[in-house]
Structures are given as C-alpha cells and as structure tokens.
Amino acid sequence: MAVQAPEVDKLSLNEESVAKAPTKGSAAQGTAGDEDAENEESDEDDDQGVAEGAVATGDKKKRKRKPKKKKKKGVAKVQSNPPRVPLSTLFPNSQYPEGDIVEYKDDNAYRTTNEEKRHLDRMNNDFLSDYRQAAEIHRQVRQYAQKELIKPGRSLTEIAEGIEDSVRALTGHMGLEEGDSLVAGMGFPTGLNINHCAAHYSPNAGNKMVLQHGDVMKVDFGVHVNGRIVDSAFTVAFDPVYDNLLEAVKDATNTGIREAGIDVRMSDIGAAIQEAMESYEVELNGTTYPVKAIRNLNGHTIGHYLIHGGSTGKSVPIVKGGDQTKMEEGETYAIETFGSTGKGYVRDDMEVSHYARVPDAPNVPLRLSSAKNLLNVITKNFGTLPFCRRYLDRLGQDKYLLGLNNLVSSGLVDAYPPLVDVKGSYTAQFEHTILLRPNVKEVITRGDDY
C-alpha cells in the first residue's frame, strides 16, 4: 500500500536473539532425525540379545525378533489446498522461516558494540517471530493464489475472498468474534488493481468484475500477527507482451531494497529506483512506451498496527528529488514501486473500498447514532488496521454507508479511494517488507516467486 505513515515502532531486530528458522515453506523436523537414530541403536541392542540367547540354548533355532515400530514425532504436516492448516500447526516450535538476509552496503555494515548491546537490552523476543509468521502466511497464501485462484474468467470477489479466507485460516483467527481480527489476520485488504488502476481497489458487495486474459492485475494484501504487519504485492499478466513492464518494476523494487539501509537518504533510494525502472520500454500494438515511475506513489514505514507508520512516519520516494530524511536502525519499511505506460501520475477515481480509523483522532461529537455504533464496531474489530466494506458485511453490518461517510467527514476514519493513471495505460507493482536490523536487513517477505 502506498501512502504516508503514522508513528514508527522501533523495537530491536538484533539478529543474534532469534534462532535460525528452517527453510522457507517447511516446518522444523529436527526431532524426527534424532528419534530415528535412537530407534536404530535400540534395534541393534535387541538383535544382539536375541543372538546371545540362541547361542546359550545351543540346538534351539535362531529366531530374529522383529523390532517394534515406533511412531516418528516431529514430522512436518503438509499445507492443504486451499490453505486451511494453521501455521502454528506446521511449525509447533514457532521457529518460522527467516526472510532473505542481506548485508548492508559499505559504510553502514559495521555497528558498534555499544549499539548492539542497547538493542539487545530492548529486544522483544516475539518481535521477529510474529513478523516471520506473518510473512510465511503471506508466502503460502500467494503461492496458492498464483496457482489456483488468479485465472482469466474468475471474478475479483472470488479471488479476494479466496485470499482472505486463506490468510484467516492460517493465522487461526477467522475474525468473526469481537476483537479476534486484532490478534492476527488481514493487515491490509486485498487490492486487485487492474490495468490503469494502480492501487486501493477491492471489490465491494455486488461487484461483477471478471479478470480477463489481457489484463495486468496488481495483487496487494497484508498479513499481521499481534499487530506486526507485513505488506507485499506482485503483478500478474497472462500475455507475455507485458513482461518488460513487470520486469522493470520488479527490478526497481529490488534496487530499492538493495539501496536501503541505516543512515541512507530517501532521496538517494528514489533516484536509484527511477533510474532502474525507466531504463525499460514496452511495445504494445506496434507502439513503444517508456516505463515511467509513478511519481506520486511511495513506499513507507510500517508501525505497530499501523500500515503507514504513524504521524512521524517516513515515505520512500520512487523518483529523484526527494527529501534528505534518513532511514534508521530498527525501522520497518514497505519498499514498493509502481511503473506505468501512461503519465506516471495517479489520481483518485472509482468507488471507495479501503478505510482505516485515524490513530489518535480528536474527540469529535457524532450526531448520527449509526456513526457512533459503527465507530464502536470498527474500533473493537479492526483498531487502526485498514479494512474494507466486505469486512463490515461479514460482521453482519448493513445500511452502514451513511454512518461510514459521516465518520470520514468527521475526520475519525480515513478513506483510501482507488488510484488510477490515464485510461488505456497499464501499471505494475512489486512490494516487499524489510526490517532494518542492527547488522543486516531482512527482506521478510521474500519468496521463490519474487
């Protein structure tokens, strides 16, 4: 998701405090190997005892006693299709796969001993575990979506609900009881942004849109565990004519990740991203289009229960000329880039689906009882996490639009309308969440797909 951020949550991310998790996508299986070794030793002892007994009896026929079969413990369960096995079942020891560990470039590769100690003192042991659990859920769900859900002829509603139902199942929190969604679940509603629409479009109730073979669709959704949000997005196109567009944006995002680090200026990251992206061209129907970075969309910090990091949050530009603000140790960032064959500039358009309660909003008297009741529902079920209209529908809310609009106009809830470039253009997006740990940066949402 691309917007400004609330307050940055600076818990330490020291690499030494969390044991290395098993390989991505597989649960820890160490205990099974140890038990097999013990079984082999006990079997050898049994066989030796049988042999000695046979010698002692002389004429008695030797009989080899069959070893008892013991059940192996610790063997990983396999994820179902569609994904419905909670991740905690697949990883019973809570050792979730770590992300892609990247060394810092040059001047910020070394952190002093005192700094490391300070971060160890402030370390929250659950911090990395929550992030890694959320990231592994994102990987498993998007893998399922790419293989099974996202196909021409499928409705956007079917795709969105398939993704969201899978996320909720893997977190073990379906979000139908009050406050359940605040424990774990969707960290950002599923955006299914087609062609010239770059961001913030999710189907509302009654939506009849169907994915077509010639479409370019951005799939953007977030997962959270205990308020630790991972935000990641990818683009799908079935026609290879769009390959260069997708490659340009993927290259730009990876460039941003490579350049990011402690004490790095946002302006330098933006310049590197733009240079990478705008070195590509796309040929459509005999016309060559330069790929343009969408200059008014940015990456952002991520805070605790805050997709945009808080009132003191930072933005990561994707074009040159940004401010001189620096990244800092302990921060979490969504590095996302958007490319377009159009103007490279987006504006608000179409029906709103995305909303979020404003953190630390002033006390505003509400005249409409429907607005008061709805604000209570939003606060108890989503807090400051973004939500969409379908989430209110599944909680049994109806006829809430008047109250919702009143909350927006009162400044208590933010509306995030879809963002579009010119009609006829095509846009693409890739996004990862990174953690700026003291000695390394961890691309927490990295997978085999992107």
Swiss-Prot record:
Q: Name one GO molecular function term.
A: initiator methionyl aminopeptidase activity
- Cell compartments where the protein resides: Cytoplasm
Please give the CDD domains that the UniProt record associates with this protein. Answer: MetAP2 (cd01088)
EC number in record: 3.4.11.18
Q: Per its record, how is this protein called by name?
A: Methionine aminopeptidase 2
- Compositional bias ranges of the Acidic residues kind: 33-49
**Top class in the EC scheme:** hydrolase
Under PROSITE patterns, the record lists: MAP_2
Task: Return the Basic residues bias intervals.
Answer: 60-75
Per the record, what is one GO cellular component?
A: cytoplasm
Q: Name one GO biological process term.
A: proteolysis
Provide this UniProt record's keywords sorted from A to Z.
Answer: Aminopeptidase, Cytoplasm, Hydrolase, Metal-binding, Protease
Residues binding substrate: 200, 308
What this protein is reported to do is described as:
Cotranslationally removes the N-terminal methionine from nascent proteins. The N-terminal methionine is often cleaved when the second residue in the primary sequence is small and uncharged (Met-Ala-, Cys, Gly, Pro, Ser, Thr, or Val).
Q: NCBIfam families per the record?
A: met_pdase_II (TIGR00501)
Superkingdom of the source species = Eukaryota
Q: What is the lineage of its organism?
A: Eukaryota, Fungi, Dikarya, Ascomycota, Pezizomycotina
**Disordered as annotated region, ranges:** 1-99
Q: Does the keyword Isomerase apply?
A: no
Q: Name one Pfam family in it.
A: Peptidase_M24
Catalytic activity from the UniProt record:
Release of N-terminal amino acids, preferentially methionine, from peptides and arylamides
Coarse class of the protein's main subcellular location: cytoplasm
| InterPro entries per record | Creatinase/aminopeptidase-like (IPR036005), Met_Aminopeptidase_Type2 (IPR050247), Pept_M24 (IPR000994), Pept_M24_MAP (IPR001714), Pept_M24A_MAP2 (IPR002468), Pept_M24A_MAP2_BS (IPR018349), WH-like_DNA-bd_sf (IPR036388), WH_DNA-bd_sf (IPR036390)
